[in-house]
Amino acid sequence: MRIAIFTDSFLPGVGGTEKAVLGLATALAENNEVVVCAPYYSRKYKDDFQFQVLRANSIKITNNDYFAFPFTSCKFKKELKKFNPEIIHCQSVSPMAKYALSYAKKHNIPVVMTVHTKFKTAFERSIKSKVIVNALIKNLVKKLNKVKQVYTVSNDMIDELKSYGYCGEVKVIRNGATFSRINNLEEVKKLAIQKYNLANEENIFLYVGHIVKFKNLEFTINALKIIKDRGINFKMLFVGHGFDDDYFKNLCKKLGLEENVIFTGQITDKDLLSSLYGAGELFLFPSIFDNDPLTIVEAALHHVPAITIKNTGSSERITNNVSGFVVENDVQEFADKIIEAISDKAHLKQIGDEAEKTIPKDWSTTAQEYLNEYNNLITH
């Protein structure tokens, strides 16, 4: 099958959607012809994958975000026509999706779309006008109504899309795992332990992702303050970078957490990132914005359970007190659960082992679920 995946977020950008597109495209390419259609990034990067990548002209918005102009990209359009896709899968809803819908209509092929993001929350972060936000949501729903099938990665997102006014069917297909399963965990963690001087730390907590306010990191830091005030020693690793790096570093300084917290910055070395996961004992993820965060899956692959907030997409893979922890959206309860978890390291290890067994899902399984959907749409 010839499959074209359209996305506004791809490598060398950093984020969950980028990882999801890479994982899905790689798995689909095992037995299919796949092309990923994405914006051109100005920094040097070589596309070296099992699948083809077509880059559309774009302009830089941030270091991680580019606005694509596929309608004016002659080479891009020529190569896509040559590829001649049988189905198009949109992984975002911005300019690339608009072109995908236009191309599909002209060539009479089906389009499906996976929605990864709570767009209203994302829009409201940067746009103060409710009128403009509502207009953007209305435009999103208009696009959703033009595709053959809408997918998302969590049940929480089904309600989110309904709140936008979308009334069509939404199916949940969860993301796959990015790392392979870890067989030599003690060896894997040595690199991070040495680099960040963690050998004598009693309790090591971890977060991997963008360092931004909407990830609810202030919630985490306030919980850490409670834990420190109880006289508990720990080291917290914030792995990643973002617009609010300085804000959170200053907050940690203000709360007297400088000696307890390490901001590693962005980690692009896969071995070091894997080692950081392995060194952690508990993954702190109180985000109410994320839907099916791959970082929780990656932590689980390293036998590290997550603590999340109840009734969020982040918590859906977790069975409370079995494969991780789920608490109310309350800083005190979050802190209490962390303290409870680290008070019995043998039980915490059991929960981490169960997380490794039950939370990850292979990308090959996700790809097969989508292939079944593609075949059904093409033949009907």
Residue map of PLM features:
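Short hydrophobic beta-strand element within catalytic cores of glycosyltransferases
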Residues: 305-308
